[in-house]
């Protein structure tokens, strides 16, 4: 788990010992989380990834990954086909984050969702004092080149979860790649991750 990105490392830690559970990693990238879940916990991990080169990389590692678009292809999965769905740092790139959340909670019993927090104090400072869209560790790409089309804050996500009837089971906040406490997370956290259950579907 040491080589996993911080949010993926938390998921691997939390799911350790859940042998036989089924996990769908949406936007799975190079499959690092899936490989860790399979190798360390005996979890049946599947993935969806839009980038064909990353799909090939996953398949070469013996991972079960299909090329697909989270905005449309989650609809092909039956209700509660997985114990957990995972969407890490992909939500802001989706066309309709609200619909993606519906689908994650329809397809899985629970969902892990992580994202860069647009209300972090460095982001606020860049807008307030520089008058420009920020380029930070959490948002490293200039506005004209980023894949993010829907920036989100901790408070925005909590409001969306409530609107969707989802229950926030647990939450984690990160700054500098390390976990931080909950107080003041909307301005202190560079990244946030939530474990959700329920939903309207």
Roles of regions detected by a PLM:
Residues 27-29:
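Class I SAM-dependent methyltransferase "Motif I" SAM/SAH-binding loop
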Residues 99-103, 110-201:
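S-adenosyl-L-methionine-dependent methyltransferase catalytic module, highlighting the catalytic core
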Residues 73-79:
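Short conserved loop adjoining the S-adenosyl-L-methionine
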Residues 31, 35:
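Glycine-rich SAM-binding Motif I of class I
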Residues 3-19:
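Conserved alpha-helix/loop element of class I SAM-dependent methyltransferases that forms part
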Residues 36-73:
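Class I SAM-dependent methyltransferase SAM/SAH-binding core
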Residues 84-95:
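A short SAM/SAH-binding and catalytic strip from SAM-dependent methyltransferases
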């Amino acid at each position: 788990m040491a080589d996993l990105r911080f949010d993926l490392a938390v998921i691997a830690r939390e799911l350790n010992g859940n042998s036989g559970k089924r996990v769908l990693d949406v936007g799975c990238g190079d499959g690092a989380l899936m490989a860790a879940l399979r190798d360390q916990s005996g979890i049946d991990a599947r993935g969806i990834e839009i980038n064909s080169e990353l799909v090939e990389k996953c398949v070469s590692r013996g991972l079960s990954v299909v090329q697909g678009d989270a905005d449309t292809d989650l609809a092909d999965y039956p209700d509660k086909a997985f114990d957990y769905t995972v969407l890490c740092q992909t939500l802001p790139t989706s066309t309709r984050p609200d619909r993606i959340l519906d689908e994650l909670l329809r397809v899985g019993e629970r969902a892990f969702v992580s994202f860069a927090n647009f209300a972090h104090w460095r982001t606020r400072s860049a807008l307030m004092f520089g008058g420009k869209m920020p380029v930070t560790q959490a948002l490293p790409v200039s506005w004209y080149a980023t894949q993010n089309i829907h920036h989100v804050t901790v408070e925005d996500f909590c409001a969306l979860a409530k609107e969707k009837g989802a229950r926030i089971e647990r939450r984690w906040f990160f700054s500098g790649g390390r976990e931080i406490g909950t107080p003041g997370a909307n301005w202190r956290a560079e990244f946030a991750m939530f474990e959700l259950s329920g939903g309207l579907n």
